[in-house]
C-alpha cells in the first residue's frame, strides 16, 4: 500500500504485513 506500515513506507500494490 501507500500507507506507512510498521514504520516502513510500503510500496503501493504490496500487501502491508
From Swiss-Prot:
Tissue specificity as recorded in UniProt: Expressed in skin glands.
Keyword tags: Secreted
Location(s), subcellular: Secreted
Domain of life: Eukaryota
GO CC terms, sorted: extracellular region
Family: Belongs to the Frog skin active peptide (FSAP) family. Septenin subfamily.
UniProt-recorded name of the protein: Septenin 1b
Annotated organism of origin: Osteopilus septentrionalis (Cuban treefrog)
